[in-house]
A protein has these predicted regions:
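Anion-binding alpha/beta catalytic cores of soluble intermediary-metabolism enzymes, centered on
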Residues: 1-206
Length: 206
């Protein structure tokens, strides 16, 4: 199991991505970020008040947080640019520029806009926010893969029973997003989970 984690980490290092962490002062998030920066796994963008983030890093002895890019949503130099982008994306839903300007300071929305604008590759959140709050801006801004209409999540389950999955490794979907999927949604969840198993674990789904 540790071997799999090491393989995933090495692949991440070889294809280093820019990842946004909207919950910039959440303890588990910040400690994980410090480890990622220490190991050189990814380039991180922390969202939040810089003074508060740095104070938390000092309190918890996280010496490598200084390697992250820290962005204050209230004072982002691209705030107006992102507000215009959000307004354009949501204009068919009747969003005004004033509404967009209010949302763009929300770290979850800002993170998705940073990705949509090509300034980052991904976002990780949910330690402090609900699944619904995390997914809402992602669906409004980033949207789903073409051809996929059902949003789903996948979990990596590592067991000590080699007879299950691939040497005890199972990829499970969907356990949190779509509560009562119909037949078509189940089919899409199966396809997406199989893709995740292949790309993350190197498993040939059966």
């Amino acid at each position: 199991m540790q071997r799999l984690i090491n393989e995933i980490v090495e692949r991440a290092k070889a294809d280093r991505q820019r990842i946004v962490l909207p919950e910039g002062t959440e303890e588990r998030t910040l400690k994980a970020a410090n480890q990622i920066l220490t190991d050189g796994v990814a380039d991180l963008i922390l969202l939040g008040n810089p003074d508060e983030i740095n104070a938390c890093a000092t309190e918890w002895g996280l010496g490598n947080i200084s390697k992250a890019t820290i962005i204050d949503p209230e004072n982002h130099p691209k705030k107006e640019e992102y507000a215009q982008l959000l307004c354009e994306l949501r204009k068919k839903k009747g969003m005004t520029i004033e509404e967009a300007r209010k949302l763009v300071v929300n770290p979850l929305y800002l993170g998705c806009l940073i990705i949509k604008n090509g300034d980052a590759d991904g976002q990780l959140a949910g330690a402090r926010n609900t699944t619904g709050d995390v997914l809402r801006p992602a669906l409004q801004i980033i949207k789903t893969t073409p051809g996929i209409t059902c949003v789903s999540g996948a979990m990596l389950l590592l067991t000590h029973a080699p007879e299950y999955g691939k040497n005890g490794i199972l990829v499970m979907g969907d356990v949190a997003v779509t509560p009562v999927p119909d037949a078509e949604q189940l089919a899409q969840i199966a396809v997406c989970t199989a893709r995740t198993a292949k790309s993350v674990v190197g498993m040939e789904p059966k």
